[in-house]
A protein has these predicted regions:
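Amphipathic terminal alpha-helices
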Residues: 280-296
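NAD(P)-dependent short-chain dehydrogenase/reductase
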Residues: 137-186, 190-198
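NAD(P)H-binding glycine-rich loop region in Rossmannoid oxidoreductase-like domains
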Residues: 43-82
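Active-site helix of classical SDR
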Residues: 131
Length: 296
């Protein structure tokens, strides 16, 4: 049986990755929907747009992701990241289908010295983090049949991301200062797409309540932004790109409107145990993405 999978959004890193993955499969039909048919800022139009497509599962991946801009436009970010997610949940409940929602490490303060587990207290430092947390709560209120997947440090061959920014800056510079006192788990959107589809399939196939709730899903392994950048340039140089030196700098040397968590590491043991999902090591996935970008 072909499963109809509704995806919120029609572009961006995760949607691009989902479209690529779905193109190789015959058991799913991906239904990406975005503006004007689905405008997450227009609350009253969300449910009719979703219900008209009658999906078997909903992947809620579209979001307001401009972290710094959200500091001066939290109302818009809240409408998209918070209120709209609740409306998606209500529509799913009426249809009797599960929702898999993508969230973020930004719901945490980053003060914990070890990787965060799902039950750790939240404490977002930024407007973006607050609105994403609001979306988690709104979805949980709207429907019990959901899985919230928190991820971090997303990159891919698509959209705007750290890997593409580093490669672009490296074209005209011999050295770059990159923050070294923030640590996390770089995560390829291509791997996220695999995880989303696996969890969606599990929720369709089983009504086991243990498969619902909050899960952490990131690339395996950890590094700093400076370490991530150094690996990107090492890989690029090995493929014929120019050599770029990474100079580690503190967060204080690169001020931004939104505060970032110092520790973005997420413990992914729960999703591996219950859903059988373990994303690949970040270095291997980074090599695959860099190779595509450099070759392209």
């Amino acid at each position: 049986m072909i499963r109809r999978i509704l995806v919120t959004g029609t572009d961006g890193q995760v949607v691009g990755s989902l479209l690529e993955k779905a193109a190789t499969r015959t058991d799913i039909e991906l239904l990406p929907i975005g503006r004007p048919e689905l405008d997450l800022a227009a609350t009253d139009k969300i449910a009719p747009a979703i219900e008209a497509l009658r999906p078997d599962v909903i992947l809620s991946v579209a979001a307001y992701t401009a972290v710094d801009a959200a500091e001066s436009d939290e109302a818009t970010a809240l409408a998209v990241n918070g209120t709209a997610v609740g409306e998606i949940g209500k529509a799913a409940a009426r249809l009797g289908v599960p929702v898999v929602h993508l969230s973020t490490d930004y719901v945490f303060s980053g003060d914990k010295p070890s990787p965060y587990v799902e039950s750790d207290p939240t404490g977002p430092l930024s407007a973006y983090g607050r609105t994403k947390l609001a979306g988690e709560l709104a979805l949980a209120t709207a429907t019990a049949n959901h899985a919230i997947l928190r991820t971090a440090w997303v990159y891919s061959p698509f959209g705007k991301n750290f890997v593409k920014t580093m490669l672009r800056l490296g074209e005209t510079r011999d050295s770059l200062g990159v923050v070294a006192d923030q640590i996390g788990n770089p995560t390829s959107a291509l791997d996220i797409a695999d995880g989303l589809l696996k969890v969606a399939g599990n929720l369709i196939a089983s009504g086991d309540p243990a498969l619902r709730g909050i899960f952490h899903m990131t690339g395996d392994g950890e590094t700093s932004w400076a370490g991530f950048a150094a690996e990107i340039f090492r890989l690029s140089a090995a493929l014929g790109g120019k050599s770029v030196t990474v100079d580690p700098i503190p967060t204080s040397a690169y001020p931004t409107p939104a505060k970032r968590p110092g520790n973005s590491r997420l413990d992914c043991g729960k999703i591996e145990r219950l859903h059988g999902v373990r994303l690949p090591n970040w270095q291997g996935s980074t090599e695959r993405v860099v190779r595509r970008l450099v070759a392209g």
